[in-house]
Amino acid sequence: MYRYNRSSPFERTPEKRVSRQESQRKSIELPKLPPLNTRNSFLDDSDNGTDNISIGWTPISDTQQFQSPVPQAFTFTSKHSARGNGTSSSESTPKSTKYVKERRPPPPPPLLYSTESIRIDSPMVSPSSQSRERSPNKLSFIGNSEERHHMEYISNHSRILKSPFANGFSPNSPKSPRDSSKQQAHFSDESDLRCHEREKALPPIPFTTTLLLSPFDDEDSEFFTKPPPPLSTSRNVSGNSRVSEALESVYSDSDYTFNNSNARQSSFNSLLGAKPLELAPSITAPTQPFSIQSIDEHKLYQCDNVYKLSAIYEWILKVYFEWFNECVFTKIDLFQIVQLLLEFQMPTNFDQDTIDSNVDNIMASFISQKAVRFDIINDEEVAVVVGGLDITGVFTELLPCYSFIDNTYGSTNSLICYSNVCTHGQSSGFRKEIKLSEIINKSVGLWTEYWHLTPDDLAEINPREVQRQSFIFDLIILEERSLNMATAAVEIYGKRFDKSLLPDEPEFKALAFDIFEPLIQLHTEFLLTPIFWKLKTRGKFIDGVGKIYSKWCGEAKNIYLNYAKAMATVHEIIMWEKKNKTKFVTWLKEIDNSVEITRSKMYHDVIFFGGFFKSLQNMPVTLRSILKNTDPSMEDYEYLKIVIKEVEKLNFEVNQVHGLAIDHRKLVRFSKQLVLSTNSSNATSYVNVGGSTNANDDDAIQDKLALGLTYPERKLVLSGTVYKKRDLWLDPTPVYIALLDNCLLITEEISKGETQKYKLIERPIPIDYLSLEKRKIPGTSKQPLRNYSQKEHKSPMHNFSTPINSMRPLLKSSGNHMSTAYGDRKTSNTEISNANPNTDEFSFKIRNTATGESFKFFTESAEVLNQWIDAIMESFKRNAENHDLNAFEFTVLSSEFAYFDKDAPVNLPVAPEGSEIDVALKAYAQKANKDSCSWSKTTRILCCEDVKFEGRIYLFVATTDGIYVKYRDDYGSGFVKILELNDVKRMEANVKLGLLFVLDNRKLCYFNISTVVSRYLAQGNTLDENCIVGTVIRDKVRFFKIADDFGNSKHLFFERKGKIVILTPEFDQLTNQVKYFKFYKEYKLPSSSNNILNNEIEDIAIFRKSFAVCTKKTVILYQDSFEDNGIVLPSFLNDKDMMAHLRHPHLNSLPFKSATDSKKRPSIESLTEEAKKDIATCKAIPVNFFQISQSSFFALVYDEAVVKINCYGEMSDWRKDILLLDFCCTGASFHGNHLILVGDNLIQIYDLKNVEQNLGELVPVQIIKGKKIKLASSERREKTILVLSHPNILNRQLLVACNPVAMADHQ
């Protein structure tokens, strides 16, 4: 079809086109053509000679299935029989025989009979028996848009087509030899010119039979005639019973759909044609779900006029009523069927968006003409197809090409066809790629100027349309400017750049200049090319911008993200070079002053710092303006709404990635400037967090620190210069600190040559160990961290009036009374400052909870202080999100006890939002229902014990003032003192014995639990009226423990005068209460000759047949079967090197390295070896001894390491069985297969469920930070109660319980 360069509202041009010769892109004046007889060209001639054929299968007898010729009365004469059977039609218009020859052959019908049962003149022939003659330059195509739409029009010469499946015959052979010779001569002239059609190839037809049948004779015209009806009692099982699988169907007749039918009926009885009831098709309710895989190529073959809604409707009726009448079709099934049909019939290179839009249009037309409806059955939309309707419609985007039927194809042909399926237009490359020079050398300008519109022309156009088209041109101008900028970066800056300008940045050219090439290709191919094509084909009113940009968004994400990452590096390099005034900066100025750049104003800051970022930001603004002037009924309206969100999302992602890349680039630059001496103690990395080190690695120093500064995921949160507080009232010294996402680095600036370096002066602090502390003002109970700088630093003098700031009195110098905040940096930093005013103004304090080191920093303003505090708190929050699955949760038991002034911490630890302590405090505040500061008792908590007695849980707290008790879950009432004991070291309750054992001032005594509880319940009476009397068992006792199952009985263990004494309780036979404890056994502790200089006991681990005593020096294992002196654990009998070391005569005089010296060695193996020597020589302090998960392995906890031993007391491999600790462990408990290690400022929890795992490879599953943490529970298994400093209330102790988190809580 020919079309001038004028827009048409009924046509859509797909975005992608194959390029054509450049000469055909020019605007041409086409001669006016006579009006085309379009109805005879590509529409149905459905009203000529149609017969009224009723619905149903035409019955034939069994004897007539494959026999004599059929009477003429049963021959189809409708448009379908003329098309499919090849009968002549005097009313058909002349047609090029090229279409007849290259028409896609229909698929053969399935074979139902064997070779013997099929007659020679049977219409059923195997496809494998065909011997088709094909030209070597012709390919087999199906779905050819030029051939498949016009077979219903036959030439004026009367002819009958032979069966397309007969051997040796072409399916398009003419009946007359004279006609055959003429057509073959015409075909030979055109065969070479039309060999590049872009259509789908015919897939193989899945037939397994290879029957060889004889071809039909030329005179066997009876094959294409309708067979006679069968007998009324016979079942139609002939080939025609499944004729729908081949060429025709009963639904192919237009009478069924009443399209232009002269015998339209109105009753179902008349539709059946008054046939006998047994001939009517059975009506059954469909029950089977439909599968799109059931639609094969045979069925898709039977609808080739997909541009006509009536043809699609007839084909849908076959699918619904005939082929799959037992299936239930959902809404999505019907859409998929139409989608599959169009994709099958259209060429493979056909635009997918055009297919998708036409699928929607086809379904919308069916619904509007009430041919399809959707009923909701069981919450599912079921499709219902209505038959017998007059359905009409033509889809212009699917129309075939009919303009070049009688025209020869030549390079000099100036005619242009705009059909989407025109094979000539596709093969000749009419839509060629737009050259970049055509875009950057000229601009389209304004819409009115481009089309030379006068005010009179604009007055006739809708103002909204004028605005809409003007904004579309604004998009074009925006794209042209972006491409001009990218071309300047590649052609001018890129080609003139020399790598010698940046010798340390070898990838700068690829990141700064080559990165623009994919952007140029992206914008040219997906934006400007389709938009300019629309300008040429649609005229002044173009549409479909939203769909174009939607495609662009799908392709632009990865390219733009790479561009954002590259520009971050380019920005940092340019800024760095400008700061140092290198020769690269001089080169940039020379390029900026060149003629090309001055004329185009594409300076380096415009290209590299603005670039495509600005165009991406302006894009959704312009698209939103187009949307406001777009009518909601237009198809592009929804596309614009979607694409605006997609572009905004892309813009957000690009900005986010660009920001992260900038931060990472700063970190890379900082890593190049970081200086560290390998002999410094700072070269040691942490063991439990942040990775490990290896002495054999020759990597950079940063890798030895396990900081991962060059890792892509590493982030630099904040960095800058602050002032660090020093001792002896010296002026603060400036330091440069860098907060990373995994650690905090404290450095000082140094000059090394012409560059600036940063020397690491303190050990890096991991985020897991970093704690932020704040100072409280007396009289305030709780202060939010957000107002930290505004409240605490409001006045520089308020800190000097507090009695808890522990500051020395100010010394005023008689010679100089002037003071500054941080002193003069030019003066010596070692000079003593007598004034030191404003010391705590704008300051914050951090602490390394692993080492206990603290650092106080000062900032120059409150704004900088808030930046640091917010950055640190945000780092805490992100670190907590990475460990969202906690093994334990904490419950606050009480906050009623206060510190003595000398024990109270000066600064309070900050509990980050969402941390375990913060969550526990919030839950406690809701339960308490009162001010937590309303009551407090200044004392020191010594130990705790919770007792479950008579269905209630009582919490006993031993302090220096006595023993207090209350209901554990009662947050409304406070503690009640019941026992006047002031030096309780240990307290343990045994409910089975009904006794509370207390070790007070080295006196071991016990009280009756029922008496103690009764005293608590009688709170109204005074202590003098109801005195509680206990029984003293022994004096001079330093430790005791109760065993429920040692030697199959209960025993009392205690240490007295260097011996472990075991007592057995004796019960009263009448009251079943304990009368007294009698002696059972006695074990001697090792003497000082075995290097046991201190027999102070930390704990006793009791098992069924043995027990282990943890002293301050070592662990001794005793057996129950006999009395011996015990075995020292761990045993090194399997370690020859260590045994030789222990037998060395000069062992005690060897100059062993100190702990500080050992930490200078960065090797984990060397540190492990040092820890093993400390354990063997009794330098490590034992903390506790546990059995791991009821296995044959045991865990020995020391202050600096954890050791796993087997049942023989040996380490299988000391390199794998020793876990080094980053902190000094003061207490340990074993709770639910988890090992809880407690330090002064840190709690680490390890999972020991997998006993086979190497202990040295374990990492903590949970880390809790605090201050003045102490393990308070006397029982160290399955009970863990801790005491720590309250993070929000001054001088307050916090009593918390550690409970395992259930799996349901994780989920």
Curated annotation (Swiss-Prot):
Renumbered residue ranges of the record's region Disordered: 1-144, 164-194, 219-239, 780-802
Comp. bias intervals (Basic and acidic residues): 12-29, 176-194
GO biological process, one term: signal transduction
SMART domains in the record: CNH, PH, RhoGEF
Any GO CC annotation of this UniProt entry: cellular bud neck
The entry's keywords: Guanine-nucleotide releasing factor
Biased composition (Low complexity): 87-97
Boundaries of every DH domain copy: 467-657
GO function term, MF aspect, one: guanyl-nucleotide exchange factor activity
Domain spans labelled PH: 715-877
Record's keyword annotation contains Cytoplasm: no
InterPro entries per UniProt: CNH_dom (IPR001180), DBL_dom_sf (IPR035899), DH_dom (IPR000219), PH-like_dom_sf (IPR011993), PH_domain (IPR001849), Rho-type_GEFs (IPR052233)
Residue span(s) of domain CNH: 938-1279
Pfam family, one: WH_RGF3
Keyword set includes Transmembrane: no
Extent of Polar residues compositional bias: 1-10, 37-79
Top-rank taxon, per record: Eukaryota
Gene3D superfamilies in the cross-refs: Dbl homology (DH) domain, Pleckstrin-homology domain (PH domain)/Phosphotyrosine-binding domain (PTB)
Protein role: Guanine nucleotide-exchange factor (GEF) for RHO1 that stimulates the exchange of RHO1 GDP-bound form into GTP-bound form. Required for signaling of cell wall defects to RHO1.
UniProt subunit comment: Interacts with RHO1.
PANTHER family found in the cross-reference section: RHO1 GDP-GTP EXCHANGE PROTEIN 1-RELATED (PTHR46572), RHO1 GUANINE NUCLEOTIDE EXCHANGE FACTOR TUS1 (PTHR46572:SF1)
UniProt domain comment: The DH domain mediates interaction with RHO1.
Protein name (database record): Rho1 guanine nucleotide exchange factor TUS1
Organism, scientific name: Saccharomyces cerevisiae (strain ATCC 204508 / S288c) (Baker's yeast)
Gene designation per UniProt: TUS1
